[in-house]
Amino acid sequence: MEDNSFLKLSKKIEKILEKNDYLKKKVEQLTKSVDNHEFKIQELLLLLRKNNIHPTTTTTTTTTTNNNSTCVGISNSPPLSPRTSTDSMTNSNNSSATSSTTPSPTQTSTITTTSQIDPNSLTNSNNSFIPINSPISQTTVNNNNNNNNNNNNNNNNNNNNNNNNNNNNLNNQTITSPLSTSSSNSNSNSNSSSPIVSPVSSPQLSGSGNRPRIQFLGNGRMPSTGNLFKKEDSSDSLLKYSKDSEHLYIVPTTPRPSKSPSMDFIASTSLINTVSSNNTDSTNNDNSSILNDQQNQQQNQQQQNQQQQQEEINFITTEDKLPNLPDSNCQWAIIWEYSANDDEWTKALIIVEIDAKPFAKGALRNAYQLKIRSNAMQCFNHFATPIHEKYMEGKKLNLSQIPKLNQNLSLDTLYVAKDSKTSVNFNRYFEDVKMQMVCKSYGERYNSNHPPKKIEFLSAWVIEIQGTTNYRVGNRNSSNNTLYGLELFMKGEFKKQNSNFGTVFTERNTPQSFSHFTYECTTHEMVVVDIQGVDDIYTDPQVHTKDGKGYGEGNLGQKGIEKFLISHKCSPICLQFGLPPIGLETGRNAHRVIRGTMLLPDLTPDLYEPEYPLIENQPSNPLNSELTSIVHLSGHDERVCSLLINQDKTKLYSASADGYVKIWNLTNNEDLSKIQMIDSFRAHRRSIEKMLLNEKYLFTASSDGTIKIWSLPTTTTTTTTSKQSSSSSSSSYECIGKLEDHTAEVNDMCIDIENNFLVSCSFDKQIKIYDLSTFKCIKSLNAHGKSIKSIYMSGKYLFSSSNDQSIKIWDLEMCMCVYGMNDAHDAPITSLRMFGNRLFSASKDGEIKDWNLSTFQPTTTLDQHNMAITDILVTSNGYLFVSSDDSTIRIIDISNQNEPIKIISSTKAHRSGVNSLATDGKRIFSGGCDNLIKVWNWKNK
């Protein structure tokens, strides 16, 4: 009901805003402001949960007159939600406080506030404040009668003296919220009041002064009934709205807690000590004990001493307290680090060793190798100069923290320091570092959506090397301090993926999809381009913002965004993230994104190549070789549809169109022609199209639409070949399960060993995924427009082919199609196999294509079969054995990837079509439509 009401209200508001441009702008400004505060509150709540702290608020107001107690107001507030207004909290509590009107002269008031803050958790190893999100303070207002027997005469006198002050405090209470920690402790013996930390405005992120608006929603996708690549189990809940006929999509992302404290929550050391002391006093005395003035003075003195000691530790300002430089090549340097989460800078002092000459020179900058020889120290005041204040003009500087740098790296880690060849303003260095750290933050959000390949932007810093009189850097006297941009040194081939002006230099999809992600993630306010680096570790990006503000001179504003939109070509990663296709008006055109879009260059390292059988007795001259028949195995009454050899190559399984499975003994290695049937049973009432084995089970797929699971016998049972012994009652194989989720004949199967999944395809146009631990179907994919004839698994990717003449590639982790080619063949595709970085497909018209998975283009096409190709056997020697309905077996040489594939041998194997092939490394087995299994030897002519 709330969702329907919200939608109706939203429609009404949109209609009003369409007629009033001024009001529309005001609403947008208000929305951005609310999002900024809500983002901070979400970060705060995450930190609360992380520290197992549950915010609670209890406010009790009691008025007692002449020993008669009257309850004025008791309220127990629930934990604050991110949308709870601080103003509403203040109003509600003020009304409660006002309800206890001015007490009579015989009354006394005591305001006691306890805040559940652990004093030990407020400082870190650097003696700097770590902001924790404390629970809501419990504020109790007690009005005690002057004749209370629990208080002595002195306490009564003190209470009377402080009566007026307490009344004032009653009307001016500070109500704490998750955004601030307020604590006041006033009693008859205390003359000190604790300072109050009030919330300040949320820091801004972007150069234009507005943090990019990001909605943290669940996975969504474009509503489209014609999109084959839409997840079945996803909901069309993606938030979108229309503005000037332009659809804006909010990308599903995951909120992350701030990794470093914000200025919103930073307090001085004296405040921390005071709060800690007050909380400790209130807790130990059960909110009612009264300390005398002498004890308070002693505590105040101790606090001052502790504060002075901490200041001496945190800020070393005298020259004799600086450590000595390790050697003459080292120098002092001040380093600045930017936090994109908090929009603030921290700085520290470090020791660096920088090369005198640059190891690389670009058009605009020089690059020097540098090593950091010390941990970050807070004694930067030793080198304080007026220029440092100019550096931080318009920026937030958090002096209570120091840069984190890369804490897990050794002191021998190489960095790159970059300076400009020409004279530039110091802001250029700070803008570049800020821009790279903002892009790093967006890269982390991109990775949280589980792309095929993750990315990373290098962390960056600004350093100022302090000048000396006897050291020169880059042939320039460094008596004037020199600024550098600093980042980690990258090894590898440096490539530029796209440019600031929209040019795309590579076919890789990951960089382009990241740029598209940033464009949608910020609701079209900005885009990250100029992506370059080693593999998917990037540096030196450029940001274009809609208003053209911030991010240096390279920010081309709306013009730069338009250049990206013109050159961008969506990829399946964009579809995976639910990003609207750029340049396509409706989701029904989304299939155009797939065609011709190169995704596989990103995925080929993740493909897995199985262990193909090795032909041990390969002829010495394969180009002049042939297949010779060794023996014919009879026993089936109908055509042999499938052949399978077990892992240890001791058994041959054959299945036929009458539903029978027969097992043959292959252990006689002395005479390869002696092969005996050892078991037989009827598995199905109709034809068996495919068999599979794992360590425990035999799987049979049939044209009756079922898959049966058979337990493997523990011992070998010898059975005669007579038909009387061929009944299932005498077999040692027992059916332990049947999968009946398909509605038509099951054509092919494969096993995902790593995840223990069974994948099947059927005439019903569906791919089904089964969990072998439960034998339950966990996912169904509406994969093709016609019957699916063949599937092949490699790593986490599944290849499927269909009678609709298409080949599709599926990511089984996401259960979605990541690539598709609609016209791979001119006829139904019957078989798929892989060898190295190549995919082989065969069709009903007798054509074989060799596809390069780096470009997904066919490199060779063979068209020498007269009828449909039924099976392909791949060997590790680099040969394909191909069976066909034209009754032949052809051998194709694929060993040289740089040369076209070619047929080296052709044999008429059966009287009619050949349906299946298998090998144990010594012999080739073929099953035909003539009900025979033939055994072949490959040898020289």
Curated annotation (Swiss-Prot):
Residues 57-70, 84-115, 124-206 have a biased composition (Low complexity). Residues 57-234, 276-310 are annotated as: Disordered. The keyword Cell division does not apply. Keywords: ATP-binding, Coiled coil, Kinase, Nucleotide-binding, Repeat, Serine/threonine-protein kinase, Transferase, WD repeat. Gene3D superfamilies: MHCK/EF2 kinase, Phosphorylase Kinase, domain 1, YVTN repeat-like/Quinoprotein amine dehydrogenase. Pfam families: Alpha_kinase, WD40. WD repeats lie at residues 635-674, 683-720, 741-780, 783-820, 824-861, 864-902, 909-941. This is Myosin heavy chain kinase D. The gene is mhkD.
